[in-house]
Amino acid sequence: MGKVILLPEEIRNKIAAGEVIERPVSVVKELVENSIDAGAKRITVEFINGGETLISVIDDGEGMTKEDAILALNRFATSKIKTEEDLYNIKTLGFRGEALASIASVSKVEVRSKTETEDGVFIKVEGGVIQEINLWQGSKGTVIKVFDLFYNVPARRKFLKSKTTETNLIVDFVKRIAMAYPEISFQLIQDGKNKFITSGNGKLEDVVSLLFDIEIHNNLIFLQRKEGNYIIEGFISKPGKLISLKSQDYFYVNRRWVRNNIILQAIKEGYKNRLLEGYFPFSIVFLTLPYHEVDVNVHPTKREIKFEKEKEVYEFVSKAIKEALDSEDKRFFSGVKALEGKEHKNHVGIKTEKELLSLPMEFEHKSENKLSEDISEYISLKSGFRIVGQIFDNYIIVETKDRVYIIDQHAAHERIRYEELKKELSLGYLQNVEILFPLVIEVSEEEKELLNKHKDLLEKFAFSWEDFGPYHIRIIRVPYEFLKFDSKSIENLFQEIISDISEKDLSKLEDKIIKSMACHSAIRSGNILVREEMEVLINLIFERKIPLTCPHGRPYIWEISKEELERYFHRR
């Protein structure tokens, strides 16, 4: 083993820079956060060639004196913390005193800064070594220009991604920080071209409208809730809208942009039964809580944080998301306007709701969707809508005063059945009946053991069975409304339940079983409906104001405004 030596300051700085300055966007982040901490109201970020050639950050903050500017170029020089206790009550974005020194050690830096009362200073640094110090006759604030990033660390430059990737990372960061501070005007200049400039008027909605396209802006729900010392606000995507297989979240804790799995899982819990498995909603979430309950000193990048009270944060966030989505469901239905001066009528002698919509076996209609001409007694469609008809044997088109709705009949009825089954289960209303010909199903020893373990739970769902040899069970009783199912349909449902039976969380298992039962008992895609059946379904949707997705998270209703149609056909 070689002799242990103390590394020279130059090498120590480069190692430290490797932790703080990973790529060009790290430079932008550190400099912009310093500008915010300095009280800036206007911040201009400019970069060239993905930040490798130039990164410039200009602000109108409080500025630095000559002494402070020189000191800032040394590691662990900061005005933001003074004692160990300060580490547990951090209110600024920067606090370690590493940023400028780390940047200067791996690039060529020019610092220009001036306070309100003292002369300005110009400092030129190369590779962490000060080359020049002069007076600067500028206005109050700070200008920092970073040239030739990693010029003296070729290995680091070699591992940078493409110019496009590095550019996108910088643009994304400035977008994120601009949303966190809508009261600050941010300007972004990329390769000499103005990318965007925010107004700094303090309105988050205006920043979101500027930074994202109209589709995103029009499909967001406002989020706001306060409970004790916890506050959450921001925007989340409407049910079934703006979902993606990739995480598309903007999380902020005390206005610090972070990555945090607790928040992510809480949001997904809030979207429970409204989000497709494996998908993520679009979210811009600001969480405010006491500073001492958040540890931001977990990693040099300050992106990772720890909550002192993880359970409380999780429950607060998930509840806020669910309440916002519930409110959106109510808003959606309350905004529906019935047709004026038109009474749309239907047959009076229709079947009950249960008869019409409970059993998919009853929907094998061979006739066309036409009402008999010779019936004289009618009833009005309760919601004041006009059913245009059914298309592709799955979608119902409904007209109101200023909207057209296209409804997925299976997904909509599946949600109705899901809500009904949940209620019936909680009240103990599910009843079972003996099937005429007991159904024998093949199961493995492990599956049989799990079924017997959860027998009490499954009996709550009105299923009953008995052993029928070492590898079979015989189903004797099923829920009442499954009585008219053919044996194959019942077997498919029970096999689906068996596949979920290994779930250890009983509440999740219950929910999975309810979903399976709802799916199997709902109207199927491909079932041709008569107008009576469509009317019952539409009335249930709009009267009960059910959530706008099926239990698995797929949207079941598409709203198209008259205005959208007229714009498409260039009528306005």
From Swiss-Prot:
<dbReference type="Pfam" id="PF13589">
    <property type="entry name" value="HATPase_c_3"/>
</dbReference>
<dbReference type="GO" id="GO:0016887">
    <property type="term" value="F:ATP hydrolysis activity"/>
</dbReference>
<dbReference type="InterPro" id="IPR020667">
    <property type="entry name" value="DNA_mismatch_repair_MutL"/>
</dbReference>
<comment type="similarity">
    <text>Belongs to the DNA mismatch repair MutL/HexB family.</text>
</comment>
<dbReference type="InterPro" id="IPR037198">
    <property type="entry name" value="MutL_C_sf"/>
</dbReference>
<dbReference type="InterPro" id="IPR042120">
    <property type="entry name" value="MutL_C_dimsub"/>
</dbReference>
<dbReference type="GO" id="GO:0030983">
    <property type="term" value="F:mismatched DNA binding"/>
</dbReference>
<dbReference type="GO" id="GO:0032300">
    <property type="term" value="C:mismatch repair complex"/>
</dbReference>
<dbReference type="Pfam" id="PF08676">
    <property type="entry name" value="MutL_C"/>
</dbReference>
<dbReference type="GO" id="GO:0005524">
    <property type="term" value="F:ATP binding"/>
</dbReference>
<dbReference type="InterPro" id="IPR036890">
    <property type="entry name" value="HATPase_C_sf"/>
</dbReference>
<dbReference type="InterPro" id="IPR014790">
    <property type="entry name" value="MutL_C"/>
</dbReference>
<dbReference type="InterPro" id="IPR002099">
    <property type="entry name" value="MutL/Mlh/PMS"/>
</dbReference>
<dbReference type="Pfam" id="PF01119">
    <property type="entry name" value="DNA_mis_repair"/>
</dbReference>
<dbReference type="InterPro" id="IPR014762">
    <property type="entry name" value="DNA_mismatch_repair_CS"/>
</dbReference>
<dbReference type="InterPro" id="IPR038973">
    <property type="entry name" value="MutL/Mlh/Pms-like"/>
</dbReference>
<dbReference type="InterPro" id="IPR014721">
    <property type="entry name" value="Ribsml_uS5_D2-typ_fold_subgr"/>
</dbReference>
<dbReference type="GO" id="GO:0006298">
    <property type="term" value="P:mismatch repair"/>
</dbReference>
<keyword id="KW-0234">DNA repair</keyword>
<dbReference type="InterPro" id="IPR042121">
    <property type="entry name" value="MutL_C_regsub"/>
</dbReference>
<keyword id="KW-0227">DNA damage</keyword>
<comment type="function">
    <text>This protein is involved in the repair of mismatches in DNA. It is required for dam-dependent methyl-directed DNA mismatch repair. May act as a 'molecular matchmaker', a protein that promotes the formation of a stable complex between two or more DNA-binding proteins in an ATP-dependent manner without itself being part of a final effector complex.</text>
</comment>
<dbReference type="InterPro" id="IPR020568">
    <property type="entry name" value="Ribosomal_Su5_D2-typ_SF"/>
</dbReference>
<protein>
    <recommendedName>
        <fullName>DNA mismatch repair protein MutL</fullName>
    </recommendedName>
</protein>
<dbReference type="InterPro" id="IPR013507">
    <property type="entry name" value="DNA_mismatch_S5_2-like"/>
</dbReference>
<dbReference type="GO" id="GO:0140664">
    <property type="term" value="F:ATP-dependent DNA damage sensor activity"/>
</dbReference>
